[in-house]
Amino acid sequence: MSRSEEIIEVTNHYGAQNYVPLPIVISEAEGVWVKDPEGNKYMDMLSAYSAVNQGHRHPKIIQALKEQADKVTLVSRAFHSENLGEWYEKICKLSGKAKALPMNTGAEAVETALKAARRWAYDVKNIQPDKAEIIAFNGNFHGRTMAPVSLSSEPEYQRGYGPLLDGFRKVDFGDIEAVKAAINENTAAILIEPIQGEAGINVPPEGYLKQIRELCDEHNVLFIADEIQAGLGRSGKLFATDWDNVKPDVYILGKALGGGVLPISVVLADEEVLGVFTPGSHGSTFGGNPLACAVSNAALDVIIDEDLPGRSLELGDYFKSELEKIDHPAIKEVRGRGLFIGIELNEAARPFCESLKEQGLLCKETHDTVIRFAPPLIISKEELDFALDKVRSVFE
């Protein structure tokens, strides 16, 4: 039995079976490449669901991690820390928002944004107590905690977890008339992924986000953009909402915010929204900890200094155009923006992902029939050509 087989066996024996990973063990990683314990090399075309936009173990991020780890790693929010204010300033100036509230995981940040929206609805908009509603979209993925699960339209994400939370309405993604029909006097917010990731890289119709912005302005409703996966350069823009030149009232960021090293997430908004939180009304022991802030400061610097949004736009256009040239009866559609691309098939995607793994290319199926490609944004054109050769070979 190989070392990889031993690891997989003990993992399956002791671990809850809530994941079905590809049968590969990753023991080393650098840039866009990973290795298994046997020394086999693979190209990472998933980036931990966009958490590794800067590439594995980016030297600037690792250096920031090491330097901070030698000083202080955690103090809780009971005390001030040296670099939280610096990180606040950087992320607020980058987003154009006045206030930031840090958490750890994406789901925590979504929960935080929903709490802010509800409290804003009661304290600012004067919706009657316990009547606030939030509109979300079919096909959404906002996390695995109870509020995001209650928002989901995926039966398996909800099965056995009832009673689900109330106060949510769901409409079809891309249907502006459905959004109009769902808005009423109790609507507090519209929560949307500017590009739906888990649903299969679903890109909204051109101008759709602008229409939502206009509806929110007309009805005094908060526009909440979940940019956890599509943001921070992944779509070819710094924020995926930039494709429609709109600014949401609330940004939710995570994943690449931690540079593929530590979990850190944030809710960004102006004083009117985040000002609803008072001392004791929300919190997180690890949220905004010194180690995460140091890592995130470096992660943001890499995104800007290396123009990762621009790289994603240029290389994504090339990659998508080359994928569209592949003529195979199983391919239904190629879609995406930047280096955030899905190949929708008319059959199961898993066997193709397994074949690509055998070719040295790691990716993951989503919603059964879509192959998702989201490589680190530091990838070179030559490395993309390597990936294209492997993709072409499995469709021959």
UniProtKB/Swiss-Prot annotation:
Belongs to the class-III pyridoxal-phosphate-dependent aminotransferase family. OAT subfamily. One of its GO terms (biological process) is L-proline biosynthetic process. Its EC number is 2.6.1.13. GO terms for molecular function: identical protein binding; ornithine aminotransferase activity; pyridoxal phosphate binding. Its cofactor is pyridoxal 5'-phosphate. Catalyzes the interconversion of ornithine to glutamate semialdehyde. NCBIfam families: Orn_aminotrans (TIGR01885), PRK01278.1 (NF002325), PRK04073.1 (NF003145). Keywords: Amino-acid biosynthesis, Aminotransferase, Cytoplasm, Proline biosynthesis, Pyridoxal phosphate, Transferase. It catalyses: a 2-oxocarboxylate + L-ornithine = L-glutamate 5-semialdehyde + an L-alpha-amino acid. Gene3D superfamilies: Aspartate Aminotransferase, domain 1 (3.90.1150.10), Type I PLP-dependent aspartate aminotransferase-like (Major domain) (3.40.640.10). Pathway: Amino-acid biosynthesis; L-proline biosynthesis; L-glutamate 5-semialdehyde from L-ornithine: step 1/1. It is found in: Cytoplasm. The gene is rocD2. GO terms for cellular component: cytoplasm. The modification N6-(pyridoxal phosphate)lysine is found at K255. Signal peptide: none annotated. This is Ornithine aminotransferase 2. It comes from the Bacteria. InterPro entries: Aminotrans_3 (IPR005814), Aminotrans_3_PPA_site (IPR049704), Class-III_PLP-dep_AT (IPR050103), Orn_aminotrans (IPR010164), Ornith_aminotrans_bact (IPR034757), PyrdxlP-dep_Trfase (IPR015424), PyrdxlP-dep_Trfase_major (IPR015421), PyrdxlP-dep_Trfase_small (IPR015422).
